[in-house]
């Protein structure tokens, strides 16, 4: 076999008949498969051992030669070579056809490739190929035209008239002769001449013909190879025949299709030998043509060939296409060994990097390792004995298993795998039972819960795989989410509840005002019952000497609660003491107001700051912030420890607290009935107004809805006031552990208005609450909304999954390729606004990006941050606080790295908080970050609350799809094509339009907009090109024609951010930038100049520059081109890799085109390397790392965590050389 890791690229082309014969190990002459009695393959049949190799390893068919020692001998009796039976997966045969046939892909595809080469319409071509008409091949000296079609009658007439002075034929034979006659050089020359004058349809057709003829000329393929003399027969193990119980056989459809071809071929041969009448031979040739068509692509032309039960047979094309095809089923993803799956449940005792694996499962997964160890320790005498011990679950094996699994991480995966955190590595711990145990903090990343979810487990086998799992994939390292750099391991439920309760303060608890010299002393007091967790106490700062205290208070006494003291012991010794859950306290020493003044009585101080302590228990959002802060200062390992301690303390405290909820915790509302009655009265008044014709139906509906909403809000506000902070339900809601005020309202107040199936609201509200119970009608009304919720979710999941797939496909080859592309371009960013609403603040857009120029203070002119510096949170805060509104940053959109991005333009890797490393697959991460929250977006197109005149604005998932697919948006805005002043806005009542005139310096443009559109400008306003004249969404295709690429990219970026942030989903700009850049990688050539590019050709921006460079160097005229924007589906199909495109969609079309062009796949992306089984060119698969040589006397580096350190050492070594 060839070693895939050795070759650089892969080329596809047309196979010549001789090539097909050279692949073959022999001709298949008979349609037989296997003998029904002996079940052995028939000679010369589709499974012949002489052609395809032996069915048994190292044994010929007749049994004369058995054993490896005869390897390579061809048996003199049966003619079978003695070799491994695996060759039956790779050896091909062929069928010699008695008449040539055309290949349906090249005749039937759109555009028809044969039709273009011969300049004949596909319809006429079909008549010739299927023997309905003759085509003139050589008119000789007659008055016939070359390539003229003649019916049977016309042909006879001309034959009678001219005899043999002309030549006309039918079928694939005729086509082949015509293709042979095509003079590519001459045709190309003529077409180029024609292009100079042609216009319209003629020009388009000429360009298409030129394209394909040029392709044939340059690729080394010959046009006549589109017609076949011999059909390859694929290896028998790829179209197997298996025996079922009961002696029947199941066979691959391909065998049926091959048998039809062979039968018809043999019949044709016989007819030709017998000199049968022409009409019979022609009919047989047509049937042979149809049989080969069905074999290659069944159903492409005419009715598909069906098997038993009228099921269309699966042809060669179908074996490649779709989710079940070769590409997606077997090449991009395979079933793997050493894996298992089971239900998951929670285990709070595990460390963050551990998972529990059931004993029987671990034994099966690590079987070979256990067997090896048993033999090594002498517990078993040989492997067979060891296997027996394991199968009988001997007592000796468990200790060995414990030792074997140490230091060997396993991977856990939960479907759907939406982002890279859905597969993480854990160290296995043996547990009883049959379920896999998961750490509660890992749930968030997996989106797992324990209501029956299942997970798959995989064992990395090679040393490299183990090392990567350990260093890069261990769960303890995945603290930050790649999509926004915020912690993904946020504590939830019990942990939040426990820590909230622990950090509450209460006046008048036992032991209030006691002062302690150390935390240990306080603990003794608690255990003796002298103080409670909620007691406000004094504590000596001397007890924690390493902590930073406010100046002058290093030896003072500060006020805190015992619970907060316990909580603070989770933090590192040298970290601030946290008394208040604020950003300020997380980054600075404790506020001096909590320290006792000299000679001040502690009770006075408690009166002073007690309320501040009572108001500040630690909520869920604060716990998340604290994780981020600890990560910022102390990095991975310490944060991981903090998380485990936080979990432990939370669970312990929520147990100690004894918080439960009962029916009596739901408060009663006294005047609910009065409020409802008042609302009913208002509704009656509105109905009366409607009946009198004072208001419209729409107004009546809107008013009724708003009356009931107001009523519900009133009740909700009352609930918020009456529930006490010590009510268990309030504690749960307030801490962020579970539930919120609206759940509360439904329990104690009223449920309010329900959704109708079509997305509106019922006017009749549900006035009952769950405590009172609903009436039958109310219950029935609530079911509509519930059902709609379920169906929406199901639809949304599919939509979102497909979006993710397209995103991954378009961005999979974006990898960090080098350190710095050296560009001096960048983009200027400012806060994204929608009207007066802040969508994304400037701060979020700066963190983790490199500056493209020095940022100066607008007041003093001093430099705040220099050029080419990666901004961290502190720098970003400084910039924003100084009042800077626009900052120029390095951006992926302006990066000059071919086939990827450089480190400087990308900036920080959000998952680690460090600068991104070379080899990081940022394209895939970007696609996952945008696709994963897709399920949280709405499916609906929102309307502007029924306000007339405002257009419907698409939001949520449909809007994201609309942007990434570059579709014409719903509610499209008219944009200005010139810079200038709004000269006039005139109404035109006759045709219900308004005329907006923009007067520019050079020309004046008028735009006619409908009455219903909201005009966004007024007379005298100055507008730039691309500015909106009416409200709505801009069509990016229009925008790119009026402005430039960068403006369009920035527009898409801002709009995608709006769609996500409106739904409360934060995604970093850089992910959207990666995808936007992929949509604008192509240009359309307007004028080819003196290059050999065709006009109108769409090509890669990099290739275009290279071609122009060559021409300019040789002193010619360069080509000009215009950027085009492609939707992600189109962009994924237009990629330079035919393997990646074929495995995405439209497989046959992609392969047809690629083979004619003789395309060369440079194997730069991830997919194409996965398909051919080569290591992917990302991370340690980058050539830089693959070609490393180990050194003998190397010292162990201090930090073996990051590839970056190793890189640095390599560089230092090179420089010292």
Swiss-Prot record:
SUPFAM superfamilies: beta and beta-prime subunits of DNA dependent RNA-polymerase. Its cofactor is Mg(2+); Zn(2+). The keyword Zinc applies. Zn(2+) 2 binds at residues 821, 895, 902, 905. Keywords: DNA-directed RNA polymerase, Magnesium, Metal-binding, Nucleotidyltransferase, Transcription, Transferase, Zinc. It catalyses: RNA(n) + a ribonucleoside 5'-triphosphate = RNA(n+1) + diphosphate. GO terms for biological process: DNA-templated transcription. One of its GO terms (molecular function) is DNA-directed RNA polymerase activity. Its EC number is 2.7.7.6. GO terms for cellular component: DNA-directed RNA polymerase complex. Mg(2+) binds at residues 449, 451, 453. Pfam families: RNA_pol_Rpb1_1 (PF04997), RNA_pol_Rpb1_2 (PF00623), RNA_pol_Rpb1_3 (PF04983), RNA_pol_Rpb1_4 (PF05000), RNA_pol_Rpb1_5 (PF04998). InterPro entries: DNA-dir_RpoC_beta_prime, DNA-dir_RpoC_beta_prime_bact, RNA_pol_asu, RNA_pol_N, RNA_pol_Rpb1_1, RNA_pol_Rpb1_3, RNA_pol_Rpb1_3_sf, RNA_pol_Rpb1_4. Zn(2+) 1 binds at residues 60, 62, 75, 78. Binds 1 Mg(2+) ion per subunit. Binds 2 Zn(2+) ions per subunit. Belongs to the RNA polymerase beta' chain family. DNA-dependent RNA polymerase catalyzes the transcription of DNA into RNA using the four ribonucleoside triphosphates as substrates. PANTHER family: DNA-DIRECTED RNA POLYMERASE, DNA-DIRECTED RNA POLYMERASE SUBUNIT BETA. The RNAP catalytic core consists of 2 alpha, 1 beta, 1 beta' and 1 omega subunit. When a sigma factor is associated with the core the holoenzyme is formed, which can initiate transcription. This is DNA-directed RNA polymerase subunit beta'. It comes from Lactobacillus helveticus (strain DPC 4571).
